[in-house]
Amino acid sequence: MIKGRYEDENLKWIPLLIGLVILIPFALKGMTFSYKYYLYILNTVGVYIILTVGLDLLSGYTGLISLGHAAFMAIGAYSSAILVDQVGLPFMASLIVSPIIAGLFGFLVGFPALRVSGMYLGLTTMGFGFIIRRLIIAMREWTQGSGGLVVSAPEIFGFTIKGDWANYFLVWTVALLVIVAVRRIVKSKIGRAFMAIRDSEQAAEASGINLAKYKMLSFFISGVLAGLAGVLMAHTNHFISTDHFDSMLSIYFIIMVLVGGAGTVYGAVLGTVFIVLLDNLFVPELE
């Protein structure tokens, strides 16, 4: 509880950072250089934040390592692309169904967490990522294999979300809602159970916490959020392929969480903003 108060007192400025990120495109539009690339980067930041706050819930708050979150993202992305463009499901329905599908896979992957931990669990989740990648390639009739899949623009209440600005506000609206939702989870009984498991499984079990239930729940929620990020990535980028979801991306996500500070929702946000901007804006300038 002391740690929670410490986070609240020292991270109050992070919402201001989020506000600045949202307002930046308006400043960019008035400049002489093309702002579309920068808007694309900010869209990427928003999508990744949805995933990393979920990963932080799993790794930072529950203490379970995952090196396969790119796979959950791929499941959400491909599920939505297939459901919307091939099955005919409305985008708003897919926005709910596809993340749940990813969450169910997360639930299944969570079973090893009942028996193994640490890097053994990390390697297990990484292996899951390889399996999903091969499965996507094998399901060529639905996924077009390694060639990639063209994805339609999202349609909400009869309005097609097209263009950089529309995509931007869709992504960031969802991202902010996810941040608020995860903060509420962290401060709830569920969040306290997650942190108790992270701090000491033996003590948590002795206090009456069902370890299996909460570990599986953590994997499920984290998988749902990764799948949600995948849905938005697919329908705003309009193209997905297996190259977008390789194992290095999962490690990339872990780095974001660690840089911002594992076990803090806003830390995951800050780490994501920092790493994506560093990778896309500053590193290319040094090459």
Language-model regions, residue ranges each:
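Transmembrane alpha-helices and adjacent helix-loop boundaries
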Residues: 1-287
